[in-house]
From Swiss-Prot:
Its cofactor is Mn(2+). This is Serine/threonine protein phosphatase PstP. The chain crosses the membrane at residues 303-323. It comes from Mycobacterium tuberculosis (strain CDC 1551 / Oshkosh). It catalyses: O-phospho-L-seryl-[protein] + H2O = L-seryl-[protein] + phosphate; O-phospho-L-threonyl-[protein] + H2O = L-threonyl-[protein] + phosphate.
Length: 514
């Protein structure tokens, strides 16, 4: 019986969506490697991060099948993360950029899976769709703790808050091995698909036989759902053919193209091209006037001005009410604070103000105090930005996603529970100046050493009252055989003790104690 050879048939598609100006997603699909990265950081930073990580993984597609798949994936991911760190060092303006990553390395009947962030991997097997990755997000922690249901997480306002990503800082991705079977279909997707499209609708699209048509349909569904974010998908079938595809597919930022679908280049045009045609209500154009319009009277002009003033005032009041009901966590004067309003300014006026400040007790118990409050709990100190680990510090500096006051307090508690640096150790106690250190064992057991504090040396010759040159230590007088000569005072040499490790640096690997 001939041995069954399993290979991949795959398709990849990417679209910048209907809201974003550029595509920060990058995707690679090849005979052995399927990889998807969703960049973040704004402007060009996100697409730079996703390109660096995909470039670091691409060589795995050329390797011979076999060996330790997870070790290969782990090494490639660390190389990509190091590339991000090096890029940030060369261009400090890119600080805070990062990317998610979900990738599969295929080798016959087994595959390795690496995951970090909120992109997703799905498996369709025997008609059942299963999510094979776990979101590294704030709302997923709420689901794990039983505070919200998975259905509530799907529409939670903080669902985009990522807790782990590749940002150039040390991080451990999730690595798993899986069995591959003929007939399996795998889907890798960015949150541009999983946020606006339900799992049930994704399942329907994945049941389309051809992988290219299935991928195209998934992009359409995301755009019909509003296309709020870049959307990228990889659809791959495990088949038992003698040969599979060999030409790799690049899409998204790494390919230099924002879109792969042949859609109009405007958001409205692309939206109308994929949406169902709606009935157009025809309007009869007004007939042209056959007489000259009279000039507006002063009373009518005054009425219009008054109406515009009322509308503008109402708009300002409504806008002010909306702004005052919005809260987010950000850095204010070096402290992790809950801000009220929205980020930015209008006509030189700030649209936000500090509302609550985080306060930590020596046992890391979090409380909130009002901004400007003269006193809080006696044993608490303000939660500083430098108390956080570097990845969360960068997110807070940029401002976490806004929502209600309860949402912001929940984010603050999550930071205090999981994102603080360890406390710096207390400084070692030292002897007060002027007080001699306690004698060593060798000094206390020397029988004939004088204990006078005025004597600089324990030897008799060094304390001779005459003004002659002190005797050489090796030529001690034979009259005192019970006291062997000592060439120097008996002290412990600093070179004999091991050097202590460098102390932890506050704000880098520890936080200052309260």
């Amino acid at each position: 019986m001939a041995r069954v050879t399993l290979v991949l048939r795959y398709a990849a598609r990417s679209d910048r969506g209907l809201v974003r100006a550029n595509n920060e997603d990058s995707v690679y699909a090849g005979a052995r490697l399927l990889a998807l990265a969703d960049g973040m950081g704004g402007h060009a930073a996100g697409e730079v991060a996703s390109q660096l990580v995909i470039a670091a993984l691409a060589h795995l597609d050329d390797d011979e099948p076999g060996g330790d798949l997870l070790a290969k994936l782990d090494a490639a991911v660390r190389a990509g993360n190091s590339a991000i760190a090096a890029q940030v060092e060369m261009e400090p303006d890119l600080e805070g950029m990062g990317t998610t990553l979900t990738a599969i390395l295929f080798a016959g009947n087994r595959l390795g899976l690496v995951h970090i962030g909120d992109s997703r991997g799905y498996l369709l097997r025997d008609g059942e769709l299963t999510q094979i990755t776990k979101d590294d997000t704030f709302v997923q922690t709420l689901v794990d703790e039983g505070r919200i249901t998975p259905e509530e997480a799907h529409s939670h306002p903080q669902r985009s808050l990522i807790m782990r990503a590749l940002t150039g800082h040390e991080v451990e991705p999730t690595l798993t091995m899986r069995e591959a079977r003929a007939g399996d279909r795998y889907l890798l997707c960015s949150d541009g698909l999983s946020d606006p499209v339900s799992d049930e609708t994704i399942l329907e699209a994945l049941q389309i036989p051809e992988v290219a048509e299935s991928a195209h349909r998934l992009i359409e569904l995301a755009l019909r759902g509003g296309g709020p974010d870049n959307v990228t998908v990889v659809v791959a079938d495990v088949v038992d053919y003698d040969y599979g595809q060999t030409q790799p597919i690049l899409a998204g930022a790494v390919s230099g193209d924002d879109d792969q679908l042949t859609l109009p280049n405007t958001a409205a045009g692309r939206a109308s091209a994929i949406s169902q045609r709606k009935e157009i209500v025809k309007r009869v154009p007004p007939q042209a006037d056959t007489f000259s319009r009279p000039r507006w009277s002063g009373r009518r002009l005054a009425f219009v001005v008054a109406l515009v003033t009322v509308l503008m005032t109402a708009g300002l009041l409504i806008g002010r009410a909306i702004i005052r009901s919005n809260y987010y966590v950000a850095d204010y004067a070096g402290s992790v604070s809950i801000m009220r309003g929205i980020q930015g300014s209008l006509l030189g006026m700030s649209l936000h103000q500090p509302y609550l400040m985080g306060c930590l007790s020596p046992r890391n118990e979090l409380s909130q105090i009002s901004y400007g409050q003269s006193g809080g709990p006696l044993d608490c100190h303000l939660m500083k930005l430098e108390d956080l680990r570097p990845p969360e510090r960068a997110q807070v500096r940029a401002g976490l996603p806004a929502g209600t006051l309860d949402d912001a307090i929940g984010q603050l508690r999550e930071l205090a529970a999981n994102s603080l640096l360890p406390p710096c150790p207390a400084p070692r106690a030292t002897s007060p100046p002027g007080r001699p250190a306690p004698p060593t064992t060798s000094e206390t057991t020397e029988p004939n050493v004088t204990s006078s504090p005025a004597s600089p040396s324990p030897t008799t010759s060094a304390s001779a009252p005459t003004g002659t040159t002190p005797a050489i230590p090796t030529s001690a007088s034979p009259a005192a055989p019970a006291s062997p000569p000592t060439p120097w005072p008996v002290t412990s040499s600093p070179t004999m003790a091991a050097l202590p490790p460098p102390p932890p640096q506050p704000g880098i690997d520890c936080r200052a104690a309260a």
